[in-house]
Amino acid sequence: MPGSKIFSLEGKGLKLDTAEDIEPHIKELRDNADVEEVRFLGNTLGIGASEALAKVLETKKKLQVANFADIFTGRLLSEIPTALSHLLTSLLTLPNLYTVNLSDNAFGLNTQAPLVDFLSKHVPLRHLILNNNGLGPAAGVLVADALTALAEKKDAARKDGQDVPYLETIICGRNRLENGSMAAWAKAYAAHTGIKEVKMVQNGIRQEGITHLLTNGLSHSAKLETLDLQDNTFTATGAKALSNVVGGWADLKELGVGDCLLSRRGGISLAAALAKGKNPKLEVLRLQFNEINSKGVAGLADAHTKLPALRRVELNGNQFDEDDAGLAKLRDALEERKDAADGKGEDDEEYWGIDELEDLESEDEDEEEDDDEAKKGSDDEDEGVEVEEKAARELLAAEQAEQQNVPQEKDKKVDDLADALAKTQIK
C-alpha cells in the first residue's frame, strides 16, 4: 500500500534537539517511499535532530516540496548554520525537489552560508520562498548572487541536454534588502528569464533601487504574471520606471504597488501606460495609499477598456473624493464585468470591484511635486544604487574578515598565555 504523499509535523511546537528526540516523530517518514511534500514549520530543530532528519530526507527521491519555515526559534546563532547545512545538503541530492520554503528563519550574515551554497547549486528549483529572514542588504547581495550563479548552472545543464525547469517564483519580503542589494537582484532577475511571480514587499527599497530593479532586472521578465512590491518607496521616479516597463509584461495578472508613494504624477503615468493595451490579462491592481488624485483615477477609468480582464482595483488611502466621477465610472465598469461573470468569485468580497474607501484624503491643491526628482537621469540613479551596493559588499567583506580574524586573535591570546605560564616558576 503506497504511503501518504504529504508528511507533516506542522505547528506541533516540538523542541527536537537530538537524533533521539526526532526519531519517534519521523519513523513514518522513514518508511514512506512515496512522500512528495514535507512540512516541519512551527517546530525547532537542533543540530543532532537536523542531521538525523537529513539522512532520511536524502532517501526521498520523489520529494517535490520542502517547508522548513520557522524551524529555528530559540536556537543559538552558533547552532543554525550547522543544522541548516545538514538539511540543505540533503536537499541537494533530490532531483525532483522544486519548491523550498525557508521563511521566518534568521539568515543574517552570520548564518547565510549554507543557504547561499544551496541556492547556487540546486538546479531543480522552481519556487523559492524566503519571507522574514532578516537578511539585510549585505546578505541580500549574497542571496541574489547565488541565484545568478544558479541561472548559469541551469543554462549549462540545458546545454548538456537535461530537462531543467526555470526558476518561476521568488518570494522575498520583509528582509530589509534596501537599495544596497538591488543591483545584485537586478542581475539575478535578468538571468532568470522564466520568472512568473515576484513578491518583494516591505524591504525598505527606495526610489533609486526600485528604478534599478525594474529597469535592469524585471524588464527582462517577459513571462511575469504577478508582481508585488508593496510597502517600498517609488515616488514619481520609480513610478516612471514602472510605467516604462509594464508594457513588456503581456501575461501580467496582478500588480501590487500599494503603500509605495507613487505620487500624483506617478499615478497618472501608470494609468497612461496601462491604457496602451499591452496588459490584456491584468486582473488586479493594488494601488492603496499612493497619493493618487482624481486625474489618476480618471486615467484608470479610461484605461479599463484596454484592460479587458481587470476585475479588482484597490484605491483606499489616496487623494480624491468618494463621489469622484472617474471613480464612479471605474466602479460601474467593474460591476458590469462582475454581472457578466455568471457568479464567478461572488463568494469572495475582495474578488471584484473597488475596495472599501475608508481612508481617503482630500487633494492638496497647493502641493507641488519636485520636478527635479521626476527628471532625474537614469545615470544618476544607477550610480546611487551602485554606491550603495559597494557599501553593502564592503560591509560583507568586513564581516567575513572579522569572523576569520576572531579565531586567530583567540589563538594568539592563548599562545601568549602559554608563554607566560611557561616562564613562571614555582618557588
Residues covered by each model-derived region:
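Leucine-rich tandem repeat or coiled-coil scaffolds
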Residues: 1-427
